[in-house]
């Protein structure tokens, strides 16, 4: 399962000529066969994830030195506004709490961290650590 996008018409013609009609591997075929079986469980898991993500983001918004950047991803990007640099915060969380977060200051050209949205217990541990700092 995948996508190829190109403006090169010659390349597209050559690929179409060589590609079988059913361009899918055995894993993809198996996945499509069982997809319906797990549709309800997947929908329930996604609902639970969205609910936990919303709760986590609201709690992060109450931490004075963070500014949450709105998104719909499975992580939360935050600007570290005061007290620490992104790197300092990442190092302290790792050293003092054993929690690993992503320091995005090099890639984002600013003082940013990326926090994974995990389960309620893990998210609560991170929130507790952020509040204590």
Model-derived segments and spans:
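PLP-dependent aminotransferase class I/II
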Residues: 1-62, 67-69
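Residue-level recognition of strand-loop junctions within catalytic nucleotide-signaling folds
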Residues: 7-8, 37, 81, 118-120
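Hydrophobic side chains in well-ordered alpha-helices
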Residues: 15, 89, 126-129
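Structured beta->alpha junctions
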Residues: 19-20, 24, 82, 105, ...
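Asparagine-centered polar/low-complexity signal
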Residues: 23-25, 74, 123
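Conserved PLP-binding catalytic core of the aspartate aminotransferase-like
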Residues: 49-54, 60-96, 113, 117
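PLP-dependent enzyme catalytic core of the Aspartate aminotransferase-like
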Residues: 95-96, 101, 106-133
């Amino acid at each position: 399962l995948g996508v190829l996008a190109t403006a090169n018409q010659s390349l597209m013609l050559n690929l179409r000529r060589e590609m079988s009609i059913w361009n899918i591997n055995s894993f993809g075929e198996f996945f499509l066969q069982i997809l319906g079986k797990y549709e309800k469980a997947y929908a329930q898991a996604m609902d639970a994830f969205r609910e936990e993500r919303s709760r986590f983001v609201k709690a992060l918004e109450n931490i004075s030195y963070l500014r949450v950047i709105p998104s719909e991803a499975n992580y939360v990007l935050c600007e570290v506004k005061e007290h620490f640099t992104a790197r300092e915060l990442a190092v302290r969380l790792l050293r003092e709490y054993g929690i690993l977060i992503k320091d995005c200051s090099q890639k984002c050209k600013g003082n940013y961290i990326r926090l994974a949205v995990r389960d309620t217990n893990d998210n609560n541990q991170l929130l507790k650590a952020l509040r204590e700092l």
